[in-house]
A protein has these predicted regions:
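Mid-domain alpha/beta scaffold segments of enzyme catalytic cores
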Residues: 1-263
Length: 263
């Protein structure tokens, strides 16, 4: 029996404080056998690792979200690498650029993004990229940095246009799709992703945000990645179990430090 991995969730956010164990067990019982819990600021590093040590199929990343870049402008790639050496850490991020909200100055976001890239290049752990209203700058940085040495990565919660999709695929990156793809007003996104090879697609919730149809509007949780996966299986005209198997295989290829026990 095939299973799914939620490749991007935020389980240590306060939204899950009261019922985290129940949320995790609900995911396991729904066929979501693995979860990658994402770091957004330095204060989360140790709590994330502690959580992953409690559950064998939960892993974490280490990084600073662009919204928090101004609060961690002095963080070094050496510190990121130090935490990344932990057995339970399988990715770098989420990092990147967000020029929509601009909670942090653009220059600070760019500096931290490049430090994360250096850490990814050094460790060869995949970089998990957030980009919003910054696609051209993101593409430019990724192309220039890749010339210094390759690094694996994924564009998380992909909502961009074909230019970023092509640039990411050309660099060997993966594209992660969230519940947004199920929204009625996401026609442009669906048009962009229709030709992306299945070998490069991951699925995620970005929970507690972005609940997919038919549960849109409530708190999102890892179990709901099933809805997104089922929608995409139909979209790509592939049976559900094959889609589950393909996206899980993609996850294990990209995040090759992860070992999932399927019981």
């Amino acid at each position: 029996m095939s299973y799914l991995v939620d490749t991007h969730c935020h389980l240590i956010f306060k939204d899950f404080r009261e019922d985290l164990d129940s949320v995790i067990n609900n995911a396991f019982n729904s066929g979501v056998k693995g979860m990658l819990v994402i770091s957004t600021q330095e204060e989360e590093f140790n709590p994330l690792i502690n959580l992953t040590q409690k559950y064998s199929n939960i892993f974490c990343s280490i990084g600073i979200h662009p919204h928090s870049a101004h609060l961690h402008s002095d963080i070094s790639e050496e510190l990121i690498i130090k935490f990344a050496n932990n057995d339970r850490v399988i990715g770098i991020g989420e990092t990147g650029l967000d020029f929509y909200y601009e909670n942090s100055e653009k220059d600070i976001q760019i500096q931290l993004f490049k430090r994360h890239i250096n850490a990814s290049r050094e460790t060869q752990l995949p970089i998990i990229i957030h980009t919003r209203d910054a696609d051209d700058v993101t593409i430019d940085i990724l192309k220039k940095e890749s010339k210094k040495g390759s690094f694996p990565g994924v564009i998380h919660c992909f909502t961009a246009g074909p230019e970023l999709a092509k640039a990411a695929l050309d660099l060997g990156f993966y594209i992660s799709l969230s519940g947004i793809v199920t929204f009625k007003n996401a026609e442009e996104l669906r048009e962009t992703i229709k030709d992306i090879p299945l070998e490069r697609i991951l699925v995620e919730t970005d929970s507690p945000y972005l609940s997919p149809e038919p549960v849109r509007g409530g708190r999102n949780e890892p179990a709901n990645v099933v809805h997104t996966a089922n929608y995409l299986a139909n979209f790509y005209d592939i049976d559900k179990q094959s889609f589950y198997e393909k996206t899980t295989d993609n996850f294990l290829k990209l995040f090759n430090k992860a070992k999932i026990i399927n019981e």
